[in-house]
Regions:
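Charged (often Lys/Glu-rich) extended helix/loop segments that serve as interaction or gating elements
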Residues: 1-168
Length: 168
């Protein structure tokens, strides 16, 4: 059970001084390595689907974007509409991470966690590791948004207008 493993890693051993910071870091590194290994092995083994779904949730990264879900995508949170999202560069590289997208507004409550993929709706989006190209922004596109989204969203925060690129 992955919940028990999480409790052991994040449990009270460190809080009560039984494990130092270096030991805790090593334990967490082992924990994430084991979960990644189990995830990689899942196709080769019979498994409990609910546990694998939980594992995928645990291994999903958060990618923070400089936008507001509430301003730029009101239909996403208001009527649960799913918009196509994908990287707009590094297209010749295979994505190596699974992530959800979160905004960086005053409350950071905006999150995109449903994605249209070729095989259906997914709770995470395959993305590239942004650390590979240090100093360069990782660019994503959100498509089929429609002009009225910006009007519905209003300019209610400090981020200003949504950037738009026209591709012909």
């Amino acid at each position: 059970d992955f919940t028990a493993m999480t409790f052991t890693v994040n449990g009270s051993e460190f809080n009560y001084g039984k494990v130092n910071l270096r030991q805790r870091a090593h334990g967490e590194e082992l924990y994430w390595d084991i979960l990644k290994w189990v995830s990689d092995m899942r196709e080769k083994c019979e498994h409990d689907g609910s546990q694998m779904e939980r594992l995928e949730t645990i291994l999903t990264d958060y990618y923070y974007g400089n936008f507001s879900v509430f301003q730029s995508l009101p239909d996403l949170w208001a009527i649960d509409q799913i918009f196509p999202v994908m990287p707009i560069h590094r297209l010749k590289e295979k994505p190596t991470r699974n992530a959800v997208l979160s905004d960086i507004t005053c409350d950071s409550d905006g999150k995109i966690d449903k994605f249209a993929l070729a095989d259906g709706i997914s709770r995470s989006l395959p993305l590239h590791d942004p650390e590979i190209e240090k100093g360069q922004e990782y660019m994503l596109g959100i498509f089929l948004v429609g002009a009225y989204q910006e009007t519905l969203g209003d300019l209610h925060n400090l981020l200003g207008d949504t950037n738009v690129v026209g591709v012909h």
